[in-house]
């Protein structure tokens, strides 16, 4: 059965919603493994429909939230005759979202794009076609002892990823390796295997709290080695890091995601890492999203460049045993020169580059004549553009403003992720975002860089 057969069987009442979801998840996994990404995306959308239907039926989301999802679902997957609960909601509240019940009883939508970007209508239609007919999927590479023994995977995402992993694991002491893989190319697996394979400490320096949380959750999910998994930590700004520091002191910690500020300003944490270097226990240092260091280090967060001084001290204390990794999907020649000046090793530097152009993005610039005009444009874009969707704003107060405006439009299943978001709430939001519990995020730069979600389809910079 394909995704249409399973979904239609559910609509006909032949199978329950829980049975349909189980079958659809198994199908989605098989489609992903076989590289049929368009069909995989539609299977995931069907699974998300089951979630939204349950959320609506139990009162956890409003009718407007459900209608907004139904609009996207029909444009992505197709028109169907839905259960009475759905058609009644469409008849009552679908009009503001362009959702209606057609003469044949199927739920349909009016195809409409925001006025500000009408000239891009054809491209938006391409997005809703989910790349059908394209052949851009990466070709998998056979697995080996590394992935079989230490992770839940059986194959590598690509031959390039496999080579990158082997280069990283076999890097000599006191060397720096720069690895460039395309977005979605699987750089996170490199840090996970470094931690699992060597049984010493790997420290990953990341630019944002959201990225640290995301990579922490990925590592917990992907690593199968239980000893490594229970000794993975993410530094909690303003939180309790005593267990993590104890893990460093007792030499049980395997993988830590942190920021340069935490290393430089955290007295106990910095001291523990310094001792770990001297004891030869700190073995791998990874700078993730390394391309931001030259700009952020000079103009915004000098700790990124100051950290290079600390790293040099660690190398001396370790007897030049520490290995350094610079990971990114975006590296120009001048950035590479700066990074090797900052983080290069005396014994040698190496590059592994598999850069690739991303074909799918389209950049659209919209004029606005006032704050009110801009707000109206943003609200229209949220309602009409493909989702999942992120709206980036400058500061938390603006994020709250857009939440208020969207609530006035009948939307409640919308959340914010900013510097004001508490740690526990950040963890929950990331988990819900990755699990497709909601489709719209209003965020500042605290969210996003390197956060792994494969189906984000629209980014709006407000």
Segments predicted by a language model, with ranges:
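N-terminal accessory nucleic-acid engagement/regulatory domains that precede
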Residues: 1-137, 249
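Gly/serine-rich nucleotide phosphate-binding loop at the start of the catalytic core
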Residues: 204
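Short acidic donor-binding loop at the edge of a beta-strand
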Residues: 201
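Glycine-centered small-residue hotspots that permit tight backbone geometry or close packing
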Residues: 118-123, 149-154, 184, 297, ...
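Helicase motor core with emphasis on the C-terminal RecA-like subdomain
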Residues: 159, 169-178, 182-198, 213-236, ...
